[in-house]
Amino acid sequence: GAKAVKWSCEGNPEYTLEETEKAERGTDIIMYISEEEKDFLEDSKVNELLTKYCKFLPIEIISGKKKEWKDGEYKDTTEDNVINDTNPAWTRKPTDLTEEDYEKFYRELYPMAQDPLFHIHLNVDYPFNLTGILYFPKIDNKFEIQKNKIQLYSNQVYVTDSVEGIVPEYLTLLHGVIDSPDIPLNVSRSYLQSDRNVKKISSHITKKVADSLSDIF
């Protein structure tokens, strides 16, 4: 069979690859944490980061066992603690979802928010790839307008909640999720605004919102 490979890196752009011995198939990831970063070894910190960045990853992630309150303390059960939802609402077809499904997903994202006025399900695979669900929030006054409520994902991995340059400024009051592998990451806002796919995505979102508002009013 194929030889096992060991990848090593000391936290800089350089790395080494070498053949090694491994008894079982699969990938082991071993990280060494410095004394100053020991808080990253705490279960609560690990689960916090996994939940933030991998909450909707398409591959099941297990972090220890679920806990239950017993005899005055939390104790591990025999049930795996699954961090993520591998099949979130925005990855499914609109025809497979009910209004209750959309409401449940909104509550999962924003448990303290009022019910939204309406939602828009994005599902495009040409000429760019874009999926997502956007919600138009209920706003009682101008002081309740909150931005940075749209979460950007790339293949179900969380990237950021700062979508300026992708979503028009006047639509950043929307809530929800957009997922696209065609949006370049780690680039400047000006570069984003000049990217052809980003321009198309921005125009598509604007049109979908305008169409929904037109249907209502």
List each model region and its residues.
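Generic, well-ordered alpha-helical scaffold segments in large soluble proteins
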Residues: Y32, L49-Y53, F105-L109, L173, ...
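GHKL/Histidine-kinase-like ATPase module
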Residues: S44, D71-I178
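Extended, well-ordered alpha-helical scaffold/bundle regions in very large, multi-domain proteins
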Residues: L185-F217
